């Protein structure tokens, strides 16, 4: 697992201080953007409230629980910036779960774009090129682990 620079960690922690306190509203921005980028992803969410539209999903308590979980994963990554390796097993398992429900590997890139969009919308002028790069660096480490779990789960199913 790659290590993040001290500057990356400082930028990520500083920006997450305010965002992490209001996870759901920021997560809603992230998922709204994700569904704009790929509306087909709505089909992966099967709750008592059908997610036929972005608005249906975003008003579903079950989906908002999923939003909270995603934001908690980001929170965990930020909390473990000094030792992202400690999250390896968790992230591998998360990748397996996403493969099992039909998430495609290219969707991870769209989630990354959506994360950056949320950061830009939420941070305004505090969103700088170096901050963007720091978050990209962290996200690439997280997604690399999830992708390994995704691929491993696919191999297990093929056997």
Curated annotation (Swiss-Prot):
GO biological process, one term: cellular response to hypoxia
Keyword line: Cytoplasm, Heme, Iron, Metal-binding, Mitochondrion, Oxidoreductase
Subcellular location: Cytoplasm, Cytosol; Mitochondrion matrix
Gene3D superfamilies hit by this protein: Globins
Catalyzed reactions per annotation: Fe(III)-heme b-[protein] + nitric oxide + H2O = Fe(II)-heme b-[protein] + nitrite + 2 H(+)
Binding annotation for heme b: 66, 98
Domain of life: Eukaryota
EC number: 1.7.-.-
Residue intervals of the Globin domain: 3-151
GO annotations of cellular component type: cytosol; mitochondrial matrix
GO MF entries: GDP-dissociation inhibitor activity; heme binding; metal ion binding; nitrite reductase activity; oxygen binding
Chief subcellular location: cytoplasm
Subunit structure: Monomer. Homodimers and homotetramers. Mainly monomeric but also detected as part of homodimers and homotetramers.
Family named by the database record: Belongs to the globin family.
Function: Monomeric globin with a bis-histidyl six-coordinate heme-iron atom through which it can bind dioxygen, carbon monoxide and nitric oxide. Could help transport oxygen and increase its availability to the metabolically active neuronal tissues, though its low quantity in tissues as well as its high affinity for dioxygen, which may limit its oxygen-releasing ability, argue against it. The ferrous/deoxygenated form exhibits a nitrite reductase activity and it could produce nitric oxide which in turn inhibits cellular respiration in response to hypoxia.
Protein name in the entry: Neuroglobin
